[in-house]
């Protein structure tokens, strides 16, 4: 195969893949890949088409997804041709690309300024008014033809149905679903056992295409307006004037927009907005940079897809590509199966990544992954690296088969009702037992400092540890331990001392260490504050905890099932017989956060455990989920759905600076 044939094949494969993604995004409201992956591939295609344009005919390039918007009008709504095209925006990822955009403007005019605003992740809309009345609303569609959604647009409360302006007017903007409203909808869907909506953008697009306008009204869509068609007809000559005009007529505009004179001010806004965007109640992944002076727009021109008068800056995601060498499963202390990826080593966010999580089999199936494929991986802050998408398949026809047997004991793997989780069916699986023993000795549990994972494996292999209770019987086997390689008198005495010291731990440590399903360290701390002593554990009335925010029916059911098993009863009794009757020791130093419940989300300047410790030391409690009973949500970078839920429930939101102020107030 010649170089030309290779390039042509690569370009056609990219075009086909992106066309499939475009169809899912624009027409099915069901995106197949994250924005970061889409942007990377469209940029790759664009560069190939530009570099090797002589290899292709005019028609082959003109029909590329880099040159047109791949959206179709639905048959459910009347098709409407736009009076002027509704174009998309070209993207920039670096300062150099923004400078290139500015240099292009300099060719037309020596004096200019810019208008900057958030890039809203919603659905583009064009709205016409006649004699001050909302007359017609049309989606962008493919940029030339859209769908008439007038009746649905009339259900959006912040879009005026009439305005104090009699001349014909066409305005354009973005319909979106606020993160708080998105969370409310999914909470209701959850209660009604309906499938949850994937993200606010999909929810907004799907809502706007509803045939029942009552559904649209109930979902509380919103809109930001930012553009006026034929602005000179209304004596408008800059974006700033257009914004004021829209605002005075009662349209909603983004409060976070600003004016900039040069690249330095643009860069300053981009840097500041990176932190500001996490506090907003709508999804945004970048900044739109527009030439402020409208009279130069015609001279700058446009492609079939993008104008040259504006560009969208997008923040660089923490993603890269590498080869998926192998897929394997691990079994956790509760028997839960996790699918994992072995990767060709790659540097990401300053770390060498060789392994990443694949979550579960359905995740692999949805992404169509298999061994040998080139994949995207992502890492943010302390989050475990994760495979997030497929770049290229090694073998198009093959599908990865689900694991059906436990690799450690060869027992059947059983599935939950949702088919998303698999568990090893053997409660005596050696790997489950091993993970339970390792967990019991871990830092957050009983903190047996002198016993690392390697030493525990040696003890298990030598028959010294079969259950967590065996830690407290090791002193009887001191001579056997000392006969093992690398275990001298001093190291053995340190191990035994560490085990003896653990008997002074707080009750929550041992509850967490018992590997009870759904019981993390935060729940264990709460349980310990109510149970008070390990000797109370087996007879405690767990149903009495249902009224507390930290405890749900799933946790209560798990606790009752655990204490009902004879082997677990015997384990607790053995611990008590070996003087491990731990009592609850409150860690608080002050009452500053007494009666306050905190949830933490996002990446902070210190490990999450640092902030959890501060909260507990000052009398506060930690919860893993936001609810109406949550006092504060502490947010860091890349805060996710918890932030939206907090807004929906009017929970107070703190960044790290505000938290520190609260701590010393």
Swiss-Prot record:
One GO molecular-function entry: metal ion binding
Keywords, ordered alphabetically: DNA damage, DNA repair, DNA replication, Ligase, Magnesium, Manganese, Metal-binding, NAD, Zinc
PROSITE patterns given in the database record: BRCT, DNA_LIGASE_N1
Positions annotated to bind NAD(+): 35-39, 88-89, 117, 140, 174, 290, 314
SUPFAM superfamilies: BRCT domain (SSF52113), DNA ligase/mRNA capping enzyme, catalytic domain (SSF56091), Nucleic acid-binding proteins (SSF50249), RuvA domain 2-like (SSF47781)
Keyword Acetylation: no
Catalytic activity, EC: 6.5.1.2
UniProt catalytic activity: NAD(+) + (deoxyribonucleotide)n-3'-hydroxyl + 5'-phospho-(deoxyribonucleotide)m = (deoxyribonucleotide)n+m + AMP + beta-nicotinamide D-nucleotide
UniProt cross-references to InterPro entries, sorted A to Z: BRCT_dom (IPR001357), BRCT_dom_sf (IPR036420), DisA/LigA_HHH (IPR041663), DNA_ligase (IPR001679), DNA_ligase_AS (IPR018239), DNAligase_adenylation (IPR013839), DNAligase_N (IPR013840), NA-bd_OB-fold (IPR012340)
Active site: 119 (n6-amp-lysine intermediate)
Similarity-based family: Belongs to the NAD-dependent DNA ligase family. LigA subfamily.
Role played: DNA ligase that catalyzes the formation of phosphodiester linkages between 5'-phosphoryl and 3'-hydroxyl groups in double-stranded DNA using NAD as a coenzyme and as the energy source for the reaction. It is essential for DNA replication and repair of damaged DNA.
Record-given protein name: DNA ligase
Organism: Metamycoplasma arthritidis (strain 158L3-1) (Mycoplasma arthritidis)
